[in-house]
């Protein structure tokens, strides 16, 4: 079994990455192959809603015309059985990098590389996860 963990926090020492560390440790104890993807380290542009009625070649050819890291990441996702998505909560929403990624992934609907696969989403709220300094 292979699980891809996708996180979307730019803070390398915060609560979100602490959750990722726990997931990785637990999965490794269960002998599950894991890969950690940090969305903020990828060049993933916002969807431009190209083509007719805002649907470009993504609807028919199942690839995006934009030249960034999205197509390769989506292709790699097809090699995994399960996904854990971990995002900080910013202003009652997932992070911008997570939102951008999901907006692009959604354009592929029924032909997505992750169709039928299991996904767990973890929303991390409540602070940075680092110790607070007292003044």
Where are these regions (language model features)?
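N-terminal beta1-alpha1-beta2 submodule of the flavodoxin-like/Rossmannoid cofactor-binding fold
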Residues: 1-108
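Short, glycine-/small-residue-rich phosphate/pyrophosphate-handling segment
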Residues: 96-97, 109-135
């Amino acid at each position: 079994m292979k699980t891809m963990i996708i996180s979307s926090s730019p803070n390398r020492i915060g609560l979100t990455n602490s959750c990722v560390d726990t997931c990785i440790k637990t999965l490794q104890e269960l002998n599950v192959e894991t890969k950690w993807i940090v969305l903020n380290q990828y060049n993933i542009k916002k969807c431009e809603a190209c083509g007719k009625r805002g649907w470009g070649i993504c609807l028919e050819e199942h690839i995006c015309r934009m030249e960034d890291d999205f197509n390769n990441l989506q292709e790699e996702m097809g090699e995994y059985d399960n996904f854990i998505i971990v995002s900080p909560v910013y202003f009652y929403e997932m992070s911008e990098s997570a939102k951008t990624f999901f907006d692009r992934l959604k354009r592929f609907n029924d032909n997505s590389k992750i169709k039928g696969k299991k996904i767990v989403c973890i929303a991390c709220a409540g602070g940075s996860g680092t110790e607070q300094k007292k003044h």
